[in-house]
């Protein structure tokens, strides 16, 4: 695989910092540019971040001396890279405009932002689940009038614990899903130092999260038709999302009903044997085993299991029959790894493997 020069837009924020750490020594991607707001532009990355480095590992040497570019100067950034990752904190309309500006400058965008998730010709991809949705990109390029440029996005972090667990079971006709998510403070871009209100507390509301948790799975399970992605009609989802005092690792408590109820053994077999396109293509960031089931009654736990397979796997446990639904179980994944930057890097690896950056 050839090496691609990569930029990170929003490089000084928490997810941007995670991108920087993941790109260190990446076999396919070389960090060539960092961009942020105008107030950071002109400083070295080390100066711009200052004492706001939030990762547990030291700032990579490859990033420290890079001069931060102004993210709004699209042509300047685009000229230095083959594609960009985008993780900015702006209004949704501003994000849409910025990402399309990069795409129209013939610089593909792999986005961690939510702004384009329901743009009909923008693929929202979890590589193990709906890798085929990247085939919409030629239609998007036609709309944008580009030859190389496009926007591709990853899904919301909340659903990346439970949708992968449900995906191998779709053959049994999932009709109804109730999910309660327990989401770490990393999902708000916070640490315990910057979010003291969460200590000894649970906040029972995360703005917009429940709607995303109910609607986005249906786009992931949709299909391409007439130059757009058409969402699936089923199953019916209902969700509640809570912020909990955990540094990293989102959990889901899932209740599921089937048209053709499988046995517990069939469910466990489906999870154990599941492989997605990311595994078949042997992408560098892909976990060898995407879904892991724990037999112990008290697993999975964020503290013990969030870094399973370098934080890119989904952990599942406590599968039981239910007296109102058919089954219930719990699941866990690492928000800042598979849920945010890591998921976007994996998507970029898929796009590279399929030739979309060439």
Where are these regions (language model features)?
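N-terminal Rossmann-like NAD(P) cofactor-binding subdomain of oxidoreductases
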Residues: 1-204, 235-236, 308, 314-315, ...
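Charged docking surfaces used in two-component/phosphorelay signaling
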Residues: 186-358
């Amino acid at each position: 695989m050839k090496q691609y020069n990569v930029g990170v837009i929003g490089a000084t924020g928490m997810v941007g910092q995670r991108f920087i750490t993941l790109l260190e020594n990446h076999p396919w991607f070389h960090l060539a540019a960092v961009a942020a707001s105008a107030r950071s532009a002109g400083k070295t990355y080390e100066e711009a971040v200052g004492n706001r480095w939030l990762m547990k590992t030291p700032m990579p040497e490859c990033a420290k001396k890079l001069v931060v570019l102004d993210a709004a100067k699209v042509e300047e950034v685009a000229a230095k890279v083959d594609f960009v990752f985008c993780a900015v904190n702006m209004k949704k309309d501003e994000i849409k405009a910025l990402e399309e500006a990069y795409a129209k400058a013939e610089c593909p965008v792999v986005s961690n932002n939510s702004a384009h998730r329901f743009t009909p010709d923008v693929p929202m991809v979890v590589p193990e689940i709906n890798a085929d949705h990247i085939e919409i990109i030629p239609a998007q390029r036609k709309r944008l009038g580009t030859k190389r440029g496009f926007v591709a996005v990853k899904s919301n972090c909340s659903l990346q614990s439970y949708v992968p667990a449900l995906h191998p079971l779709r053959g049994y006709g999932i009709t109804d899903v109730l999910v309660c998510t327990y989401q770490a403070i990393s999902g708000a871009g916070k640490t315990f130092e910057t979010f003291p209100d969460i200590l000894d507390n649970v906040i029972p509301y995360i703005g917009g999260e429940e709607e995303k948790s109910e609607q986005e799975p249906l786009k992931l399970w949709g299909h391409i038709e007439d130059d757009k992605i058409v969402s699936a009609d089923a199953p019916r989802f209902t969700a509640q999302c809570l912020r909990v005092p955990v540094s990293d690792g989102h959990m889901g408590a899932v209740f599921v009903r089937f048209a053709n109820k499988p046995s517990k053994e069939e469910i466990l077999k489906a999870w154990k044997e599941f492989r997605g396109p990311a595994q078949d293509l042997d992408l560098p960031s892909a976990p060898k085993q995407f879904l892991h089931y724990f037999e112990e009654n008290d697993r999975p736990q964020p503290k013990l299991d969030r870094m399973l397979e370098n934080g890119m796997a989904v952990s599942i446990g406590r599968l039981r029959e239910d007296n109102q639904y058919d089954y219930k179980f719990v699941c866990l994944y690492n928000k800042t790894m598979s849920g945010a930057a890591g998921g976007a890097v994996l998507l970029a690896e898929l796009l590279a493997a399929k030739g979309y950056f060439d």
